[in-house]
């Protein structure tokens, strides 16, 4: 059986670490992970088991470093694009920069190796920006969420547009969960019609892997959400603060550097 290699971009984030944990459960000699991060010591502190495994190669540097990202995604089965933020950063470009660099890297690989297999790109997005998936969210709450994460959502929308503009040669899957929580894995189901809060990052990661490994192409080019099968994840206590600080960053972007970093926990 050929070695299956997966690239995880954003390895120090909650989704990135959950993807690595899922892929390493259990470790397999037939699977390898290329983990991109900006800070290798931070990743090793989050996942100290990586010090003792040969299944993971860490790529450290800037997401706009074309040669680094090219090396990270070459000969992979799937690339997980999870570089984003829980903070409503003014002018956020994290997802756009990730997608742009990956697309440029794939073009270089195809030029050098015309017969190279292009990996599936799995983008972490949000149900909030999908009219169909968010249709059952409370009408009073949806605009609050869209405002509290306005800069992040604008970044995601543009990143999705970039991927869809290249769908003639790149297969992308758009994973759109609702609220996320740092919690245990309970079981998941991929869904085209429903969203649910809260989903654990471990269940989200398992869902992303399932979509990436599907050989029938049922998720290719689709917006896909995730629902629980074994009960909801716990309510993240950091959520109210995340929303309030996100609203402040939206209405008063000049306060950004004075405001705390937030996110579910």
UniProtKB/Swiss-Prot annotation:
> How does a null allele present?
Impairs the production of monodictyphenone, but still enables the synthesis of intermediates until emodin. Results in major accumulation of chrysophanol and its 6-hydroxymethyl shunt product aloe-emodin.
Which UniProt key words apply to this protein? Monooxygenase, Oxidoreductase
- One Pfam family recorded for the sequence: NAD_binding_10
EC number of this enzyme: 1.-.-.-
Single Gene Ontology BP term?
secondary metabolite biosynthetic process
Asked if Membrane is a keyword of the record, the answer is: no
Q: Name one GO molecular function term.
A: monooxygenase activity
Cite the annotated pathway.
Answer: Secondary metabolite biosynthesis
Q: Which domain of life is it from?
A: Eukaryota
Q: What does this protein do?
A: Oxidoreductase; part of the gene cluster that mediates the biosynthesis of monodictyphenone, a prenyl xanthone derivative. The pathway begins with the synthesis of atrochrysone thioester by the polyketide synthase (PKS) mdpG. The atrochrysone carboxyl ACP thioesterase mdpF then breaks the thioester bond and releases the atrochrysone carboxylic acid from mdpG. The atrochrysone carboxylic acid is then converted to atrochrysone which is further transformed into emodin anthrone. The next step is performed by the anthrone oxygenase mdpH that catalyzes the oxidation of emodinanthrone to emodin.
| Family that this chain belongs to | Belongs to the avfA family.
Which PANTHER family does this one have? FLAVIN REDUCTASE-RELATED (PTHR15020), OXIDOREDUCTASE MDPK (PTHR15020:SF37)
Q: What is this protein called?
A: Oxidoreductase mdpK
Q: Provide the organism lineage as a comma list.
A: Eukaryota, Fungi, Dikarya, Ascomycota, Pezizomycotina
Give the gene that encodes this protein. Answer: mdpK
């Amino acid at each position: 059986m050929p070695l299956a290699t997966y690239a995880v971009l954003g390895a120090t984030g909650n989704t990135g670490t959950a993807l690595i944990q899922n892929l390493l459960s259990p470790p397999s000699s037939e699977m390898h992970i290329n983990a991109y991060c900006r800070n290798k010591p931070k990743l090793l502190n989050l996942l100290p088991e990586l010090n003792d495994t040969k299944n993971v190669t860490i790529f450290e540097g800037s997401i706009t470093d074309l040669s680094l990202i090219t090396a990270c995604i070459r000969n992979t089965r799937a690339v997980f694009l999870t570089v984003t933020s829980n903070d409503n950063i003014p002018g956020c470009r994290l997802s756009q920069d990730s997608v742009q660099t990956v697309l440029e890297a794939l073009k270089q690989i195809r030029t050098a190796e015309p017969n190279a297999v292009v990996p599936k790109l799995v983008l972490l997005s949000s149900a909030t920006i999908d009219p169909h998936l968010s249709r059952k969210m409370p009408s009073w709450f949806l605009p609050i969420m869209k405002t509290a994460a306005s800069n992040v959502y604008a970044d995601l929308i543009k990143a999705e547009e970039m991927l869809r503009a290249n769908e003639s040669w790149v297969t992308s899957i758009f994973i759109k969960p609702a609220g996320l929580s740092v919690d245990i894995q309970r079981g998941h189901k991929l869904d085209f019609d429903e969203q649910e809060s809260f989903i654990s990052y471990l269940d989200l990661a398992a869902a992303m892997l399932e979509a990436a490994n599907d050989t029938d192409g049922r998720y290719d080019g689709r917006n896909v959400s995730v629902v629980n099968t074994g009960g909801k994840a716990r309510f993240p206590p950091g959520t109210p603060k995340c929303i309030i600080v996100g609203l402040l960053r939206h209405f008063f972007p000049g306060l950004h550097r004075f405001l705390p970093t937030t996110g579910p926990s």
